[in-house]
Amino acid sequence: MRLDVLEADTLVRVGWVDVWVSLYWDSPYYSEGGFTLEVRPTTENLQLLTEGRWLVRSDETPRIPMRICARANQNEDANLVLSGYPATWILTKRVSAAPIKGQNAEAAMRSLVAAAKPWPRLELGTAYGFDTTFDKQTSGGTVFAYCQTIGQACDLGFRIVLDGTGADKRLLFECFRPTFDPNNRYSPKWGNLLNAGWSFADTDYANVALVQGAGEGSQRATCWVGDVDSTGADRREIYIDARDIQPDEEKGETTASQSYLAKLADRGGQKLLAQLRTGSIEFDVDDDTLAVGDVLRVSLPQLGYTAMVRVADIITESQSSGTTRTIRLGTPSWHKT
């Protein structure tokens, strides 16, 4: 593996690194990701590895550039330590106030990127036509936060890939979602799920929200949202004070107007997005064919669980003792067996 170094704006290769003390490289599906690279503080490295430049792995397809965001030598050996993020970092530097609700997820992400102020060589890539709809509502924030919210709700990955060669290189934004390969089955009993670490929790899980807006006492605007037909132990409620949302008097809205109650329902839907069951599992594999976004069937017989789950991150760690790949799985849909 070699790390090519690209100029910040032109994307022209200005050098490469193939010797390091250590490398940590986290390739994400719809999260932040990042890297840390430690090298000797040679004159060549100090001049080559500067903030704003991009690192690209020679063994990676598609090529996902990582931006150098920070440099330091505050360590015992005074080595040069670099850290940064995938090219989707660009989207953290662009903001929007556009409301997104009931829209096609891929189209919504692409529209946000297209509407943002230009970034050198950043363009829209291929539209693959994913038909998932973002049924919730979100508004206000960085374009990255929008994409992350939409992606997590719709199981849709997003990335910025390096395309082209020489002076024709471009950064292309695209969505992606690999389909399930029945050969991707992992379990300790088959010897291909190693050093498994897991955690599950439903402490903060909620599926029904009682939202109250303007008004006082029995006249206060109130609505229920979520899985309102659920009962018993399957029903998990939260209360949301949305008094900050007021009727638009200029448009004749009152606390009983359907348009106003819809605003309260939207607030409830947004809050429920943050009240999910959590579950994660990490394990080591020797399978070099797995890629970010791949769907796996994972079994933990000792716990009586199986899950269909996506690869949320692939973490590559390289140092003098060798290279390891760790698979980090996203929040799965676990089922008792």
Please state what every model-predicted region is:
Residues 37, 84, 97-123, 136-163, ...:
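Amphipathic, non-transmembrane alpha-helical segments in extracytoplasmic/periplasmic proteins
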Residues 42-128:
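Surface-exposed cap/loop segments at beta↔alpha junctions
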Residues 14-54:
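N-terminal "assembly arms/tails" that initiate or stabilize quaternary assembly
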Residues 26-43, 78-89, 211, 275-284, ...:
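Oligomerization/assembly interface segments of phage tail-like spikes and tubes
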Residues 1-30, 192-196:
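Solvent-exposed edge beta-strands and adjacent loop segments
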Residues 2-3, 179-321, 333-337:
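Acidic, small/polar-enriched beta strand-loop surface segments
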Residues 20-28, 68-74, 160-162, 314-316:
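Short amphipathic beta-strand and strand-loop transition segments with alternating hydrophobic
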Residues 76-81, 85-91, 126-206:
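Short beta-strand-centered interaction patches in the first periplasmic/extracellular domains
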